[in-house]
């Protein structure tokens, strides 16, 4: 028994794909205590999903397939191959753990850009009035 798992952010983007021949709880404990990914990656994780496979080879193959399909931000480039030509039916992803509430893309803040636009607009109005 093996698993392919993915980390998703609050916008429901796949940000990392991995596989394990261990129990999911053991692998997640490794990730979140002494993980090899950046702190930025781990702090961006909102949900963890997985698919269970019969063999480790199946899980490894599907990891590579999903990395090429989703092109996750935190996977290493050497596992990406734009020339992958197979298409596989995806099993249903099951949720392992939800860490943060997902945000609809329309609800997302524009951050700094919003502040710049508001400041520019206020300045333009001020110039017209005075």
Give the predicted meaning of each segment.
Residues 101-130:
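C-terminal single-pass membrane-anchor helix
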């Amino acid at each position: 028994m093996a698993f392919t798992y993915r980390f998703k952010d609050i916008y429901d983007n796949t940000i990392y794909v991995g596989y394990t021949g261990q129990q999911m709880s053991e692998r997640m404990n490794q990730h979140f205590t002494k993980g090899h990914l950046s702190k930025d990656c781990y702090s961006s994780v909102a949900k963890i999903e997985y698919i269970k496979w019969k063999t480790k080879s199946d899980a490894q193959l599907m990891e590579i397939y999903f990395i090429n399909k989703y092109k996750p931000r935190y996977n290493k480039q050497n596992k990406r191959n734009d020339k992958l030509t197979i298409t596989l039916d995806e099993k249903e992803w099951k949720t392992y753990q939800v860490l943060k509430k997902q945000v609809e893309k329309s609800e997302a803040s524009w951050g700094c850009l919003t502040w710049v636009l508001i400041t520019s607009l206020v300045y333009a109005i001020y110039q017209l009035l005075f």
